[in-house]
């Protein structure tokens, strides 16, 4: 749009049209910045509401955690609804108490475990009450089963208080021996339990130990008659070397018949020698009943590696010594 310029008295100015359309365009562009449209205003209000709701949710979540963690606030939950200012005040008082006590109660693992158990039970009780109310509706408040159930749970929750027993009385019982015997890969479990202090060290079971204390084995008699050993166990026990200090009485072995052509003096001075001719103990010539275990010498052996004519025999002494040494 062009309009003619008004005539002026000066001759130096040129007469020509002036463009005014650009001014109208600038005025139309500046109008939305001052007055937003209704859709933009609605979107802005919606964003503000979402941000404010998130902020309130964070505050309420933190306050609910404080109600659960602070003991005084947790105990007053059932009686009446706590305000936010009361919860904050109880939190401040609790922190002051912990700071004054040096934090000893805060780091007590057993007290924390008992406290969290009580808190968890009460939360479960609250969830049960809420679920029954949602499932049955308002008409279920007079249900006798519901009343008895809630009464029992509330009375049990009221009785849940920390017991004065010490942590040493809460040790776990010893595991069954059959379980340890069936698991040969657990030899290091005994040392771990002994370090924890839950099971006394001398009574710990091992893979090859019987289910009674080791001290009872060490006090057992060293010499035991061979006749008291059951024949089945005598045949099943493996053969072990017997030292000179732990020898047991062996049964009488068949000896070769003495020569008949010698006189009485020679017969009294000669000791009967078995076919395998082992090196016998010094007192073997006095009595045949006191023959002890001997050191093996080169002689013919049986199919199992034992000397010919040897008897399957095992004494309790070697087993006791090996168990005690283990």
UniProtKB/Swiss-Prot annotation:
Here the segments flagged for biased composition (Low complexity) are 292-305
Transcriptional repression and interaction with NCOR1 and SIN3A: region residues: 42-111
**Do you know what upregulates this one?**
By activation of the Notch signaling pathway.
Gene Ontology, cellular component aspect:
cytoplasm; nucleoplasm; nucleus; transcription regulator complex
UniProt-annotated location(s): Nucleus
Cite the entry's keywords alphabetically: Developmental protein, DNA-binding, Notch signaling pathway, Nucleus, Repressor, Transcription, Transcription regulation
Task: Name one molecular function that GO assigns to this entry.
Answer: protein homodimerization activity
Question: A GO BP term, please?
Answer: negative regulation of transcription by RNA polymerase II
Task: State the tissue distribution.
Answer: Expressed in heart and at lower levels in brain, lung, muscle, ovary and testis.
- Per UniProt, residues of the bHLH domain are 43-98
Under the heading Pfam families, the entry gives: Hairy_orange, HLH
Domain (Orange) spans 116-153
Family matches, as SUPFAM superfamilies: HLH, helix-loop-helix DNA-binding domain, Orange domain-like
- Where does this protein chiefly localize? nucleus
Q: Where is this region: Disordered?
A: 1-56, 223-260, 272-306
Record bears the keyword Repressor: yes
Source superkingdom? Eukaryota
PANTHER family found in the cross-reference section: BASIC HELIX-LOOP-HELIX TRANSCRIPTION FACTOR, HES-RELATED (PTHR10985)
Its biological function? Transcriptional repressor which binds preferentially to the canonical E box sequence 5'-CACGTG-3'. Downstream effector of Notch signaling required for cardiovascular development. Specifically required for the Notch-induced endocardial epithelial to mesenchymal transition, which is itself criticial for cardiac valve and septum development. Represses transcription by the cardiac transcriptional activators GATA4 and GATA6.
Protein family: Belongs to the HEY family.
- Extra information: Expression in nascent somites is reduced in mice lacking Notch signaling.
Oligomer status and interactors: Interacts with HES1, HDAC1, NCOR1 and SIN3A. Self-associates. Interacts with GATA4, GATA6, HEY1 and HEY2.
**What's the name of the protein?**
Hairy/enhancer-of-split related with YRPW motif-like protein
Please name the gene that encodes this protein: Heyl
